[in-house]
């Protein structure tokens, strides 16, 4: 029997999860780092998140495919901390909008379970992708890398016009 692949809304490429974070939004949070980013910033704090593929280097594996339920199982582990600290879950990356259906599914389940949601994004995606997740987001951190388009292209690998247009919207 051939196993059918799950849809993008139910399965995505996750770099890692970090529990009990206090740096990615208010209160104590679980941060889910998605893998894959259209940018290639020279100063990226998580360069292992840039590739859209699972990578193996120096005995480490970077990335694993997870279902929404598997991700939620990790998020729920710290739910008592969220409610007592005003925290919740933060989606980060990579670029979360590179996996918009998966990101939206995670955010939707969190909102349905009254878990506060935050995202970290460069907005380097279509506006439709961004707009589709915003109803499920409590806090958005937008990392606008460089104002100058030529410098953005030099240091991030692509220009910033799309990002700038999304910020205006």
Located regions from the model:
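Conserved AdoMet/S-adenosylmethionine-binding subsite of the radical SAM
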Residues: 72, 76-169
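Soluble or luminal CAZymes and related metallo-dependent hydrolases
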Residues: 63, 67-70, 162
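N-terminal [4Fe-4S]-dependent radical SAM core
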Residues: 1-66, 77-83
């Amino acid at each position: 029997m051939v196993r059918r692949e799950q849809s993008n809304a139910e399965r995505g490429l996750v770099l890692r999860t970090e529990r009990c974070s206090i740096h990615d939004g208010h209160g104590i949070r679980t941060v889910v780092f998605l893998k894959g980013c259209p940018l290639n910033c020279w100063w990226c704090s998580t360069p292992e998140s840039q590739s859209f593929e699972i990578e193996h280097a120096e005995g480490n594996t970077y990335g694993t495919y997870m279902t929404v339920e598997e991700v939620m199982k990790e998020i729920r582990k710290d739910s008592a901390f969220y409610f007592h600290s005003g925290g919740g879950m933060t989606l980060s990356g990579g670029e979360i909008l590179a996996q918009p259906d998966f990101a939206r599914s995670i955010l939707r389940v969190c909102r349905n379970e009254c878990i506060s949601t935050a995202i970290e994004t460069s907005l380097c995606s279509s506006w439709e992708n961004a707009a589709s997740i915003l109803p499920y987001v409590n806090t958005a951190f937008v990392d606008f890398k460089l104002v100058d388009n030529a410098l953005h292209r030099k240091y991030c690998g692509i220009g910033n016009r799309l990002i700038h247009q999304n910020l205006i919207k």
